[in-house]
Amino acid sequence: MYPSTPMQYNKYKTILEQVSHPQEATVNTINEPTKSTTTLDYYNKNAKKFITGTISVDFGIVQNRFLDKLHPGAEILDYGCGSGRDTKYFLEHGYRVDAIDGSAELCALASEYTGIPVKCQLFQELDASEVYGGIWACSSLLHLSYGELDEVSYRIEKALKPQGILY
């Protein structure tokens, strides 16, 4: 019925306190070799399901706010394009678009959906200089660790034209 030993509760009240003491953290699950261990593994294994859940989401209001800041026909980088939903929207509105994603499976499906090549590339591999009037990184940069943000921010800034827009 009841356990013979009392349950142990975490002595830390906040997440911040817990992460400040990683040596005392309790591991609830173990990553087995058959389970997804990285974000890219997850997207590669679940690409079709991800696309099904995101392709029809209407981002028109946000996309238009971004486009309103750009010159007509500007070059846009869809940085972590996922399904290609936003890439296609920008193309249909007369913009030139380069699209990248780290997931090979998403790249293949997004390329098929958008009709343009989608480059399989990690954020840290962006190596462009003053090419883009806008970089669209919608729901993408959240996949980076804190330690990766400086390098990727530098690469984004370098890839943008002067006065370029990042979303």
Residue ranges and their predicted role:
Residues 28-71, 73-82:
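Conserved class I S-adenosyl-L-methionine
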Residues 83-125:
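Class I SAM-dependent methyltransferase SAM/SAH-binding core
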Residues 163-167:
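Conserved beta-strand signature within the Rossmann-like core of class I S-adenosyl-L-methionine
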Residues 133-148:
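A short SAM/SAH-binding and catalytic strip from SAM-dependent methyltransferases
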Residues 124-135:
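A short acidic, Gly/Pro-enriched loop at the edge of an enzyme's catalytic core
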Residues 12-19, 26-34:
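N-terminal auxiliary segments of SAM/dcSAM-dependent transferases
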Residues 150-162:
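A short glycine-rich, Lys/Arg-flanked "PGG" loop and its adjoining helix->strand segment in the class I
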